[in-house]
Amino acid sequence: MPLLDSFTVDHTIMKAPAVRVAKTMKTPHGDEITVFDLRFCVPNKEVMPERGIHTLEHLFAGFMRNHLNGNGVEIIDISPMGCRTGFYMSLIGTPDEQRVADAWKAAMADVLKVTDQRKIPELNEYQCGTYHMHSLEEAQEIAKGIIDRGVRINHNEELALPKEKLTELHI
């Protein structure tokens, strides 16, 4: 099985909250695609609660688009990581990490302004696969934590696992 890019970085030294360019690529037509690792939690030390991350998924995608789309950037998708320590964001364009960090903080401020669980987009059985598994309170606790802690930038060259370590791990 091929080694995925996300498994070539050392999760034991990864900072959070932090933005990292996980991957860049070009489409056959030359469009730049960037995938960002938006790390909310320190890997193997913190985890977002399932109801909170689910609610955040519904809110975060729209709020990030409000703050980041434009000037050559268009978000394709924002999806939670299975490990519940962050989200992956795929987009057209190549915004720098600070622009993404600023949009992320603004999106978290928007999450804190939501006053009622009924205001969560697509919170119904027709548009959500587990519509009863939500918590606005948990999502707002996550958002407050991001704002309080601030958002750093993780650099791949600082996190790269040495080839010897990858060999030792039988990868």
UniProtKB/Swiss-Prot annotation:
Its cofactor is Fe cation. Its EC number is 4.4.1.21. Keywords: Autoinducer synthesis, Iron, Lyase, Metal-binding, Quorum sensing. Fe cation binds at residues 54, 58, 128. Binds 1 Fe cation per subunit. The keyword Transcription regulation does not apply. One of its GO terms (biological process) is quorum sensing. GO terms for molecular function: iron ion binding; S-ribosylhomocysteine lyase activity. It catalyses: S-(5-deoxy-D-ribos-5-yl)-L-homocysteine = (S)-4,5-dihydroxypentane-2,3-dione + L-homocysteine. Involved in the synthesis of autoinducer 2 (AI-2) which is secreted by bacteria and is used to communicate both the cell density and the metabolic potential of the environment. The regulation of gene expression in response to changes in cell density is called quorum sensing. Catalyzes the transformation of S-ribosylhomocysteine (RHC) to homocysteine (HC) and 4,5-dihydroxy-2,3-pentadione (DPD). NCBIfam families: PRK02260.1-2 (NF002602). Homodimer. HAMAP family: LuxS. Belongs to the LuxS family. This is S-ribosylhomocysteine lyase. It comes from Yersinia enterocolitica serotype O:8 / biotype 1B (strain NCTC 13174 / 8081).
